[in-house]
């Protein structure tokens, strides 16, 4: 909605905004996806059908898994009709999906699925501030400059399909169960989780000792730990005794400054 406001498309319609010569619409994630094996006639899990190698791959409106199998996502189908109507009414297109591989793929698959041939240019921004949007609109690039990015995303998606669909069906044939699935990302991730679970299950805690010093200053109390640890109590006590009880430390410099600290990364599996 930030882009619509900046370009003056202030009138809100069902699935898009309009005004000032612009029509601004949006995608709800991947509205278009690669068709499932059933679409190509692979309705049964059979060894003689492997490997499944669609040529060409087909695009379909986003599907949802239900008790009845895969069905078309109604929300995705509705928004695709809105986008198709907007495409038909415009002279050219400004692509404002995320500035990255997946953002490029989202638009290109919609563009191809709808059979659109209108010329398009790329708005490449990483910030949605008014200034960034205006600057990006002044520096629009021809869509063809991002053909290689699209090719990379398209190839990745099709490779994932080939690996995931074929390997999952092969596993189903071998195991006799269709409840298992294999994927380029999900399978290694699951393996990492299982490995960590096994490590945690077999972990045996052991005691350790660590030296620390406590500093008291008025109402402030600070405790600092030495990074080294001892797995033997006698060694820790020997290290403690090696310190002079009368030793002291002097603060020679205090520096205060404001800094920006990035949020911590996600937990490491």
Named regions from a protein language model:
Residues 117-122, 157, 176-179, 254, ...:
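A generic, residue-level signal for flexible/boundary positions that often mark functional hotspots
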Residues 36-39, 128, 133, 142, ...:
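Short capping/connector residues at structural and topological boundaries
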Residues 22-23, 31-72, 180-269:
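Long, highly charged, low-complexity internal segments
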């Amino acid at each position: 909605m930030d882009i619509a406001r900046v370009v003056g498309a202030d009138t809100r319609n069902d699935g898009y905004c309009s005004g000032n010569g612009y029509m601004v619409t949006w995608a709800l994630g991947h509205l278009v996806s690669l068709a499932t094996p059933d679409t190509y006639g692979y309705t049964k899990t059979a060894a003689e059908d492997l490997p499944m190698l669609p040529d060409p791959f087909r695009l379909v409106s986003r599907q949802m898994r239900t008790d009845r199998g895969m069905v078309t996502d109604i929300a995705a189908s509705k928004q695709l009709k809105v986008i198709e109507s907007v495409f038909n009414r415009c002279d050219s297109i400004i692509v404002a999906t995320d500035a990255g591989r997946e953002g490029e793929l989202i638009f290109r698959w919609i563009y191809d699925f709808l059979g659109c041939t209108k010329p398009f240019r790329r708005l490449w921004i990483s910030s949605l501030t008014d200034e960034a949007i205006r600057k990006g609109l002044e520096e629009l690039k021809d869509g063809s400059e991002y053909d290689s990015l699209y090719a990379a995303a398209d190839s990745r998606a099709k490779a994932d399909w080939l690996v995931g669909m074929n390997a999952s069906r092969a596993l189903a044939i071998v195991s006799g169960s269709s409840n298992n699935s294999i994927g380029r990302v999900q399978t290694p991730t699951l393996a990492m989780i299982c490995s960590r679970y096994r490590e945690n299950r077999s972990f045996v805690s052991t005691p350790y000792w660590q030296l620390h010093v406590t500093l008291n200053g008025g109402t402030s109390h600070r405790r600092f730990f030495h990074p080294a640890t001892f797995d033997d109590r006698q060694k820790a006590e020997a290290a403690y005794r090696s310190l002079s009880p009368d030793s002291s430390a002097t603060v020679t410099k205090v520096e205060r400054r404001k800094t920006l600290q990035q949020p911590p990364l996600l937990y490491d599996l």
